[in-house]
Amino acid sequence: MIVRRALALAALALAASPALAAPERPTIVVGSPDFRPLPIAVAAFQGEGDAGAAATQTAEVVRADLVLSGLFDVLDPRGFLADPAEGFAAPSIRFARWADVGADGLAKARVRRGPGGLEGELHLYEVRAGREVLVKLLRVDGADARSLAHRMADEIVRYYTREPGIFATRIAAIRRGRGTWELVTQDMDGGNQQVLLSERSILMSPAWRPDGREILVTSYRSGRPELWAYRFSDRAFRPLGRQRNAFGGVYSPDGSRIAFTVSEGNVTDLWVMSADGSGARKLTSDPAIDVSPTWSPDGRRIAFVSDRSGTPQIYVMGADGSGARRLTFQGNYNQTPQWSPRGDLIAFTARDERKVFDVFVVAPDSGAISRITQDQGRTNEEPSWAPNGRLMIFRTDRNGGIQLVVSDARGDRQTPVTSGKTDLAAPAWGPLAP
């Protein structure tokens, strides 16, 4: 995979700042023999007034985010040689000292309290060229230093990759309590967890609407599985459609349709309906069990699980239900497919002969399979892709307890994003923040 840092206007300047020159960006080739993370220094952020603690936390989270991305070699601040009190204007920065510690990039920031929230003034420099290349003023509501940090990290990633960052995104999941099921969301790195909904009936399979305004879930509030939607604007929780025994709903990439599963007697088929719950119709009519639909990013195909071959396998068909073909031929228990937003891979869970569950990816056209996890606990399952298609999150029982882990698309870097034991299930990575 290639992440380009090519010629482009780099400066998104403050109104009061002078225009910045458009720098030449070197190219990062991710996954190739030539790839190396960009060495970057994140200096101690300057807190104005009573924002000192917020500035410290913001810098720490920015560093952690950049490490998690896998694109950067984030240098240890204990080895910095530069004067912490040096200014922000390029002439006041001793770039040679930053170069001496191995930095190619340098991030600095001011953090202060503004009307209704925190403000951060992010400055980014190319050390070897000795110039400032980005100035960005960011604001968040309240005193949420983590959110400010995620937005800063997103800007740094955007500068170097010309792609949106994913650090301000949220993860939805289901948490089982004592007699309750909760729909929760959290930052992609595990922070800022919030309970959206607490039910005494089963909740399953959260799925985000592409615009992030709603989360679709399977609810047993009526005693049987049905599709319900949680709306953020007014916290409403309402049923969608009239199908009973409906579960596992997922929005199409444009948000106009929902694919889902209906179980009627001994028949379990895939259906589709409009996003408002109208116009439901069958997509499959096979005697086998068809479940777990996932859309291709162009909305033209659907991958799903079927046991029509005798064991659960991944299949792909047209979004109208036509042309179903088997995709996986290895293993005898493959489930929970998730199509990458980049379109090049489908992540899924497979169980081997030892009854161990692991995460794999398969190319939707060639059927080539790669393994993401191996000998890392007995359960690695329920993968969900980040909106950039470069990272995924899944559930694992490694290290003696259930955790959520973020991995790259090759499984080379796997980072726990929940501390200790957690009872979160069915993680669903949300869309890019507006």
UniProtKB/Swiss-Prot annotation:
Keywords: Cell cycle, Cell division, Periplasm, Signal. GO terms for cellular component: periplasmic space. InterPro entries: 6-blade_b-propeller_TolB-like, PD40, Tol-Pal_TolB, TolB_N. Residues 411-434 are annotated as: Disordered. It is found in: Periplasm. The keyword Cell cycle applies. The keyword Cell division applies. SUPFAM superfamilies: TolB, N-terminal domain, Tricorn protease N-terminal domain. Residues 1-21 form the signal peptide. Pfam families: PD40, TolB_N. GO terms for biological process: cell division; protein import. Belongs to the TolB family. HAMAP family: TolB. Part of the Tol-Pal system, which plays a role in outer membrane invagination during cell division and is important for maintaining outer membrane integrity. PANTHER family: PROTEIN TOLB, PROTEIN TOLB HOMOLOG. The Tol-Pal system is composed of five core proteins: the inner membrane proteins TolA, TolQ and TolR, the periplasmic protein TolB and the outer membrane protein Pal. They form a network linking the inner and outer membranes and the peptidoglycan layer. NCBIfam families: propeller_TolB. This is Tol-Pal system protein TolB. The gene is tolB.
